[in-house]
Regions:
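Bacterial N-terminal signal peptides
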Residues: 17-28
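N-terminal secretory signal peptides that target proteins for export/translocation
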Residues: 1-13
Length: 246
C-alpha cells in the first residue's frame, strides 16, 4: 500500500502556489504593458510671458497661449504651438514651463512663478513616455523649427549670440545633419535687430521628391539643401549660382 507523507503533500502545494503566483505576476505585467495610454491636450489658456531677452525683457509681458498635455487624464506637461506627427505613434510639441523668479531675499514669500518657453518634447502615444528632443544650437527665444518627417529645420544661435546657423536635426541623432554658418557677429546683429521671438531667420521651407529645405535669413543668404538620410547636399541650382558669382 502506497503511503504519501504530509511533508510531501505540503511541498507539492507550496510549489503549485508559487507557480500560480508567478503566472499571476506575468499575466499582470503583460496586461500592464499592453494597456494603451490615453494622450490628450487640454483647453487653450492665455498666460503672461516675460522673456529674459528681446522686446519683452524691458517692456510689458507678452501673451503666450498654452495648453496642458495629459497622459491618462493626468497633466504631465504644458505646451504651446501646434504639434507635429512624426509617425502614427510619435509626435513632437514645444514645452511651456513655469520657473521660480523669486530672489534669495524673498525666500520667505510665496514663489514668484513666471511662464517661459522651452524646447521640444517627443511623446510616445503607446507608452505615454515624454522625452526632450535634442536640437543643437536651438534658441528658445529666437529659433523657430519647421518639421518634416523626423527632421527639424531651424536657425540656431551660438551660446555667445554672435553666430547664426542653419541647422537640420534628426530625432534620436546627436549630431545635426546640417549646420551651416549663416553669418558672424554683424549678421547676427542684423537678424536680431528687431529682438522679436522667432526672429533668427524666416521659417525654413520644406519640399519633397526629393526632400529639401530652403533657408533664408535675408535675401543675400538663401540656400536650398537636399536631405538624403543622414547626408545633405547643396541644391544644384544653388551650386550654379555660387559658381556664377565667383
Amino acid at each position: 500500500m502506497l503511503r504519501i507523507s504530509c511533508s510531501s503533500i505540503s511541498h507539492s502545494r507550496g510549489r503549485i502556489a508559487l507557480l500560480f503566483a508567478v503566472i499571476v505576476i506575468l499575466v499582470s505585467a503583460a496586461f500592464a504593458i499592453s494597456k494603451p495610454h490615453v494622450i490628450a491636450f487640454g483647453k487653450w489658456t492665455s498666460v503672461q510671458w516675460l522673456p529674459e531677452v528681446g522686446v519683452g525683457a524691458s517692456d510689458k509681458p507678452l501673451t503666450l497661449k498654452i495648453r496642458p498635455l495629459l497622459v491618462d487624464a493626468r497633466v504631465k506637461e504644458f505646451t504651446f504651438g501646434p504639434a507635429h506627427d512624426v509617425t502614427e505613434r510619435l509626435f513632437v510639441v514645444r514645452r511651456a514651463l513655469r520657473v521660480n523668479d523669486s530672489l534669495p531675499s524673498e525666500s520667505t514669500s510665496p514663489p514668484h512663478w513666471q511662464w517661459q518657453r522651452g524646447g521640444w518634447l517627443l511623446v510616445d502615444r503607446v507608452t505615454g513616455h515624454i522625452s526632450p528632443v535634442n536640437l543643437p544650437e536651438f534658441d528658445v527665444f529666437y529659433s523657430a523649427a519647421s518639421w518634416y518627417r523626423d527632421y527639424a529645420a531651424y536657425c540656431g544661435v551660438s551660446e555667445d549670440g554672435k553666430q547664426i546657423f542653419a541647422v537640420v536635426a534628426q530625432i534620436n541623432r546627436r549630431k545635426p545633419v546640417l549646420k551651416w554658418l549663416i553669418g558672424e557677429e554683424k549678421a547676427a546683429a542684423e537678424i536680431q535687430q528687431g529682438q522679436n521671438p522667432d526672429s533668427a531667420c524666416r521659417l525654413p521651407d520644406w519640399q519633397r521628391s526629393p526632400a529639401r529645405v530652403t533657408f533664408e535669413a535675408n535675401p543675400s543668404t538663401k540656400r536650398t539643401y537636399v536631405i538624403r538620410g543622414h547626408s545633405v547636399d547643396l541644391s544644384s541650382g544653388e551650386e550654379e549660382d555660387e559658381e556664377a558669382a565667383k
